[in-house]
Amino acid sequence: MVKAFIGLIIISLISFSFQSFASNVSDKEKVFVSHVPKKQEWSFSGPFGGYDKAQLRRGLKIYKQVCSSCHGLKYVAFRDLKALGYDQEKIKAFARQYEVSDGPNREGKFFKRAGVATDTFPSPFANEEEARFIYKGAYPPDLSLMARARTRTMPLPISDILTYYNTAGPDYITALLTGYQKAPEDMKITDGYWYNPYFIAGNSLAMAPPLSDGLVSYKDGTPETVEQYARDVSAFLMWAADPHMEIRKKTGFRVILFLIIFAGLVYVLKIWIWNSLENEFEKEMKD
């Protein structure tokens, strides 16, 4: 009797709590859930995909002319651009366009100098505090690892492993750059912020829409649209975060091929050994 009474009280409390939560959600404000980015087709998708160097060079151009005013690439060195098809002279010329901090010198002071090939892409801000002051408390993140850091939430990564889906990062970046919309009437957006349903940290962000049609010129005839810009810079950021992807895929394929051949040889050797033992055993039994 006592157990039944206690159970009834617990059920009543759970029911009341659920109704109270549902009422709060429906009457006060809706819970924001970010949209899932659409899967894109990339040259580097799948186990055998590789980077499109022309696209990477276009993405670098987008980063330099648009993104670098707010975001750094502290883990990418100028000399790494050799993988994009740049020779040593072009890399040196590209690095000289940037001003980097160095020192201390003999007088113990820090100074500015032109970049060299061994330098990394500098941050546009002296420190985090300066960035937050300029952008009303928001801090533009470094983009070096962004394409690898933005993955999907559980349990989707489990299915991604089985289907070899490894482009969630560039898919997210593309969706974010092209996903700016007018906020719904029943959704409150902080002044100076922009609504983007793909932003994983909330319903709005401090970054204004950075891309527009015709913003950056391409000499190879590639369409100069927001969608193309977003895809190009997303591919570039994927390379920045995972520059050794192609080597890893080739090495992995060779290792798997070796293991398959090795397993086949071991199996054949096993059959041969056991057949030999069976024949010897049969001879001994006859003798």
Residue ranges with predicted function:
Residues 138, 142-194:
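Acidic, glycine-rich loop-and-strand cores that form catalytic or ligand-binding grooves
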Residues 61-72, 119-126, 139-148, 175, ...:
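C-type cytochrome heme c attachment motif
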Residues 2-50, 239-241, 266-281:
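Post-cleavage N-terminal segment of exported redox proteins
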Residues 109-122, 128, 132, 202-211:
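Extracytosolic (periplasmic/ER-lumenal) interhelical loops and adjacent juxtamembrane/interface segments
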Residues 199-201, 205-242:
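Extended, hydrophilic extramembrane loops/domains of integral membrane proteins
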Residues 46, 55, 76, 83-84, ...:
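Acidic/histidine-rich catalytic neighborhood
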Residues 36-61, 72-86, 90-91, 221-223, ...:
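Electrostatic cytochrome c docking/interface patches
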Residues 248-252, 257-287:
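Juxtamembrane interface at the cytosolic side of transmembrane helices
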